[in-house]
Amino acid sequence: MPAQILDGKKIAAEVRAEVKEEVSRLKAEGINPGLAVVLVGEDPASQVYVRNKHRACEEVGIYSEVHRLPAATSQAELLKLIDQLNKDPKIHGILVQLPLPDHIDEKKVIDAIALEKDVDGFSPANVGNLVIGDKCFYPCTPHGCMVLLEKAGIDPKGKKAVVVGRSNIVGKPVAMMLLARHATVTICHSRTRDLAAECRQADILIAAVGKPELITGDMIKEGAVVIDVGINRVGEKKLVGDVHFESAAQKAGWITPVPGGVGPMTIAMLLKNTVEAARR
């Protein structure tokens, strides 16, 4: 039987509706949640992401400002802007759109964001809190994956979870979040000896490696939950995930499509984190 679709668009719309209600409640208490997005340079994909974030904020009633800086902006100038935003009482969340130009040290910039405004969840202190299980902002994409599981009624407790990819943005944090929910977690990467054998063990398989259609149906356990974080452009117009959707959907119990799976969840979680920051 073909897999059930984990519809990220539908679930993200539910999350956004919850956020909109929470924003109204906060405004009634005199708190107006605010997000600042910083974009350096002209990267076309980044421009689209930033536009989408700004529009999503408007839809739920979050105040949003976008700071567009030229690609030649110095690191010192960028750090000065972040310092100003850290001190700005109307801004509760700060997001620096990655990637940054090569001459800017990404790590230094992320470190400069005040912990209580780090709604992307990337700062070392935030990541440390995630690892030890303290209160933190969950990084948006991993959090989106967990909410997809939750809304589908899938409890990771006692299940074997395999995460393909070990990036700081998705692979590592989603592994930690699954661990916190009592899954048994394996992280696979480019040096994993037998990726197919590892994937076949998974009750929950999360693919976040950035390789088009790397994971095929024969690598998937019957009835597994497959969450595809990858978004890869093939040719001029086609977008595909890290999972070969057609073959995987014949084996999986649940699967996310690409596009329309994890992507919409990422922005919904950013809105959720911004409201959480305002509430704190």
UniProtKB/Swiss-Prot annotation:
Q: Which Enzyme Commission number(s) are on file for it? A: 1.5.1.5, 3.5.4.9
Task: Say if the entry is tagged with keyword Cytoplasm.
Answer: no
- A GO cellular component annotation in the UniProt record: cytosol
Q: Which reaction does it catalyse?
A: (6R)-5,10-methylene-5,6,7,8-tetrahydrofolate + NADP(+) = (6R)-5,10-methenyltetrahydrofolate + NADPH; (6R)-5,10-methenyltetrahydrofolate + H2O = (6R)-10-formyltetrahydrofolate + H(+)
- Pfam families cross-referenced by the UniProt entry: THF_DHG_CYH, THF_DHG_CYH_C
Listed pathway(s):
One-carbon metabolism; tetrahydrofolate interconversion
* SUPFAM superfamilies assigned: Aminoacid dehydrogenase-like, N-terminal domain, NAD(P)-binding Rossmann-fold domains
Quick one: which residues bind NADP(+)?
A: 165-167, 190, 231
> What biological-process GO terms show up in the record?
L-histidine biosynthetic process; methionine biosynthetic process; purine nucleotide biosynthetic process; tetrahydrofolate interconversion
User: Which PROSITE patterns does the protein's record reference?
Assistant: THF_DHG_CYH_1 (PS00766), THF_DHG_CYH_2 (PS00767)
Q: What does this protein do?
A: Catalyzes the oxidation of 5,10-methylenetetrahydrofolate to 5,10-methenyltetrahydrofolate and then the hydrolysis of 5,10-methenyltetrahydrofolate to 10-formyltetrahydrofolate.
Subunit structure, per the record? Homodimer.
- Extract the HAMAP family matched here: THF_DHG_CYH
Designated name of the protein: Bifunctional protein FolD
In the UniProt record, what gene is named as encoding this protein?
folD
